[in-house]
UniProtKB/Swiss-Prot annotation:
Miscellaneous note of the record: Negative results: Does not show antibacterial or antifungal effects.
Notes on the domains: Adopts a unique fold previously unknown among defensins produced by arthropods. This fold is similar to human alpha-defensin with the same disulfide connectivity.
Name of the protein in its database record: Venom peptide U-reduvitoxin-Pp19
Keyword Cytoplasm belongs to the record: no
Compartments reported by the entry: Secreted
Described function: Toxin with insecticidal activity. High doses of recombinant toxin causes impaired motor behavior of D.melanogaster, which progress slowly to paralysis and death after several hours.
Single GO cellular component term: extracellular region
Cystine pairs: C15-C62, C25-C53, C30-C61
Organism: Pristhesancus plagipennis
Keyword vocabulary terms for this entry: Disulfide bond, Neurotoxin, Secreted, Signal, Toxin
Signal sequence residues: 1-23
Tissue spec: Hemolymph (at protein level). Also weakly expressed by the venom gland (at protein level).
Gene Ontology molecular function terms on file: toxin activity
Length: 63
């Protein structure tokens, strides 16, 4: 297999893999419903998932 073929396969694989595998993602702590600022925007990231916690939400943030 030529180096260009390998590079092509790697690029295609990176395009098809979920962002949680390729990008940087992490969960916040439990952000209480009473807080004025919640979510991932305050970190310059996107909300990709939310899970309920005691009195609030845990956000999964990805860049």
């Amino acid at each position: 297999m030529s180096p260009y073929s390998i590079l092509f396969v790697v690029v295609i694989a990176l395009c098809l893999l979920p962002e949680s595998i390729v990008g940087v993602c992490w969960d916040t702590g439990c952000q209480l419903n009473a807080w004025a600022v919640r979510g991932c925007a305050q970190y310059g990231m996107r909300d990709v998932n939310m899970k309920s916690c005691s009195g609030g939400i845990i956000y999964t943030c990805c860049d």
